[in-house]
């Protein structure tokens, strides 16, 4: 009698161990290294880019460049002014680029790239973000309106009888996004998350107001022919975006032509960056992993933080900090008006604008934000650095007045940063905004228990959540009481 065949056992798979390849040793990167996941291949590169995109990093790099410029200008002023006054003219005279200097290229060309990113952010906020909903946008817009009107009126009241004041009232209307968000991030995770949203919307609206001032009020005669050329080129760029012509070989020459046309038209060419940024799509197509605006923001963020803003700070902050210069800020009407407008005007105007919008039932305070938080918000808005320095160069005709106003901007911004950080870390500002231990994410009160704010999968990428609510927390039930107590 034959025995039944044995049952087949489990199939054993042979595990092949692949030797890790270290660059510079053995065969070098080959086909096995190409099979590594994308995150393993570019972890260092992506991590460094994310480090540069962080708000704290941008603020610290901007601060380091400012300190370097001050040290350079106060220890070797001759060398500083010689370097940045180096002639760097380019092209024929009819392009109006032949008389430019090195500092002009930084303020006009490099800052145009930064304002292109501002245009991308503004387009996203107007379409998908805080400014897309009327009630959500009303609070930061009203706060920004008050924060622009009060500083302008204070500065105008202190300088309207001063000869050479020009358009000095326009200098303290702007808020520096990089510095303000950097100072806010230094306050730690106990600050209410809604305060950052309001500050971002306020800074974007402030920048929009500063851009309109530059475009409409601070130009020196407009050439209609060049303006028509720039308008035609912008229309061509809009058509290219609409037809999905995304090649850099098309868009880079178009952007350069728009910049040259606006510069020749008499409008500050940084407006070209904002206009081009507003034309980029913020909604991805079905076959695109992300929108073009999101991709450009991700690529340009590290360049802005590491190159453009520090270079502008290095070229524009070379002011004297001698006792005579600091005394000049307190005695000169223009410098005093700029400093008072930034520090006191923002502190009064931002809370007043927000209060008026809430009282008129046009807006409401975000969750977790109380009236006491509007005081540090007004102080953060008083950090007017990048755009204020740019407006100073355009608003004041006298170089001596430009140096005095730049010193006033620096002094007021440092004072506003210190006061805002102190106010944000005070117990009054952090009441009602507890933080989770060991985590940098803000916390919220859920049923009287502090816990991290739930995030959906797409929230971490900055995208919409699709209206999905987070899953309810699992509640652990207590075991039933024993019928036979001991």
Curated annotation (Swiss-Prot):
Reaction catalyzed: Na(+)(in) + 2 H(+)(out) = Na(+)(out) + 2 H(+)(in)
**Keyword tags:** Antiport, Cell membrane, Ion transport, Membrane, Sodium, Sodium transport, Transmembrane, Transmembrane helix, Transport
Provide GO CC annotations from the record. plasma membrane
Q: Does the keyword Cell membrane apply?
A: yes
Task: Give the record's membrane topology.
Answer: Multi-pass membrane protein
Stretches the record annotates as Disordered: 432-486
Pfam hit, one: Na_H_antiport_1
Question: What's a single GO BP term from this record?
Answer: regulation of pH
Gene3D superfamilies named among the record's database cross-references: Na+/H+ antiporter like domain
Compartment annotation:
Cell membrane
Q: Name one GO molecular function term.
A: sodium:proton antiporter activity
Which parts of the chain span the membrane according to its record?
A: 58-78, 102-122, 138-158, 168-188, 198-218, 220-240, 260-280, 300-320, 338-358, 374-394, 404-424
The entry's family comment says: Belongs to the NhaA Na(+)/H(+) (TC 2.A.33) antiporter family.
Mind telling me which PANTHER family this protein's record contains? Answer: NA(+)_H(+) ANTIPORTER NHAA (PTHR30341:SF0), SODIUM ION/PROTON ANTIPORTER NHAA-RELATED (PTHR30341)
Which HAMAP family does this entry report, sorted A to Z? NhaA
Q: What does this protein do?
A: Na(+)/H(+) antiporter that extrudes sodium in exchange for external protons.
- What is the name of the protein in this document? Na(+)/H(+) antiporter NhaA 2
**Could you tell me which species this protein originates from?**
Frankia alni (strain DSM 45986 / CECT 9034 / ACN14a)
Gene name tied to this protein: nhaA2
